[in-house]
């Protein structure tokens, strides 16, 4: 084989390594044991606030991925109900999946999340421009005594 077709065969980019999201959880705390097992404590999908804007002190994000061995770059982003990214500097993580492994876990702590509106938000996990998956969470206003908190 010779000519342009042969040249194209040698310069064609290789397929991206496999990186598939299996689970994406929000929780109060997460622990990675010495053997690699992850414990997620206090799973939730709703954040109750008494007023807006507010700062949510701390939460953990746990992701379980199926991945080819090697290095992978992923980014977490919080997205508002109208689709705006909330994190100006979203956490970027490097995963090193060892040979013979097929899965990888991420445990990320997020402190001081600024919430400015009610409704369905989501956490997205991305590899470059590709959204691997997301999980929703609802921001709701709670009542305090006889008065509704002012939003």
Q: Language-model segments: what does each one mean?
A:
Residues 4-6, 12-118, 122-151:
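Contiguous segments within soluble domain cores/interaction surfaces
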């Amino acid at each position: 084989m010779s000519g342009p077709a042969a040249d194209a065969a040698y310069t064609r980019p290789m397929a991206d390594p496999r990186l598939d999201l299996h689970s994406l959880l929000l929780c109060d705390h997460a622990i990675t044991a010495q053997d690699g097992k992850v414990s997620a404590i206090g799973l939730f999908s709703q954040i109750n606030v008494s007023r807006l804007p507010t700062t949510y002190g701390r939460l953990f994000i746990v992701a379980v991925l199926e991945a080819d061995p090697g290095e992978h770059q992923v980014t977490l982003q919080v997205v508002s109900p109208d689709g705006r990214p909330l994190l100006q500097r979203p956490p970027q993580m490097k995963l090193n999946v060892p040979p013979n492994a097929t899965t990888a876990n991420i445990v990320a702590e997020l402190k001081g999340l600024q919430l400015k509106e009610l409704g369905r938000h989501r956490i997205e996990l991305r590899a470059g421009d590709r959204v691997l998956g997301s999980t929703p969470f609802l921001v709701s206003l709670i009542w305090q005594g006889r008065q509704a908190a002012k939003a």
